[in-house]
Amino acid sequence: MEGKEEDVRLGANKFTERQPIGTAAQSQDKDYKEPPPAPLFEPGELSSWSFYRAGIAEFVATFLFLYITILTVMGVVKSSTKCSTVGIQGIAWAFGGMIFALVYCTAGISGGHINPAVTFGLFLARKLSLTRALFYMVMQCLGAICGAGVVKGFQKGLYENNGGGANVVAPGYTKGDGLGAEIVGTFILVYTVFSATDAKRSARDSHVPILAPLPIGFAVFLVHLATIPITGTGINPARSLGAAIIYNKGHAWDDHWI
């Protein structure tokens, strides 16, 4: 067939190489056309089951994310010595690993946001409508609250005595330090999401969509590794809000604005 014809040529390394010719060669040089921006309001979504299914997926994913990660934090905090627990590295792996798994599971349903900051960034880029963005954010926050609530329900004493996984600026750091760490950390995450899910790369390399959860999860791991000692690592407003609401003690709200 014409689109699959190949021409044998001498490559730069002096070995023959096959290059597509004809229509196949032309298709490689075509400029990628960006899809049209999502409409600001899309009332038709409200009558679609896929819209609500996506919201449920975000709720479940954020619920599981908070449940596993806060349990990990509780296990580390209650330990008397660093050698008897997974430490900061283990917490970072729990956050990064859960994001990797949950993005992989929900990408085909909701896009695998699991984070209002990611949803807001994609909305600003006109990748989704305002209706869907608001619905996702509400479901993410509800999922986070429920996830933290289940942890408290299972181990109330341990939860309340060890900070409840709430984000606070650690002693020795200023609020400015915490704000800077959160801004940079959130930027790294959102930048990685945009790069890993870039439609132009996906069209050129078929393996990119499959591998997208890996760099996203790894970025979350690295950001947590760097900023857990500063703020406990927010970078996810739903995660911070859920832990603060369920813990609901003074210091959990003092630095919540960061």
UniProtKB/Swiss-Prot annotation:
A motif (NPA 1) lies at residues 115-117. A motif (NPA 2) lies at residues 236-238. Residues 1-37 are annotated as: Disordered. Keywords: Cell membrane, Membrane, Stress response, Transmembrane, Transmembrane helix, Transport. Residues 1-55, 111-133, 197-209 are cytoplasmic. Can be used to improve resistance to abiotic stresses such as cold, drought and salt. It is found in: Cell membrane. The keyword Transmembrane applies. Residues 77-89, 155-175, 231-258 are extracellular. One of its GO terms (cellular component) is plasma membrane. Water channel required to facilitate the transport of water across cell membrane; mercury-insensitive. Contributes to the tolerance to multiple abiotic stresses including salt (NaCl), cold and water deprivation, by modulating cytosolic K(+)/Na(+) ratio, maintaining osmotic balance, and reducing membrane injury (e.g. oxidative injury). Belongs to the MIP/aquaporin (TC 1.A.8) family. PIP (TC 1.A.8.11) subfamily. This is Aquaporin PIP1-2. It comes from Musa acuminata. The gene is PIP1-2.
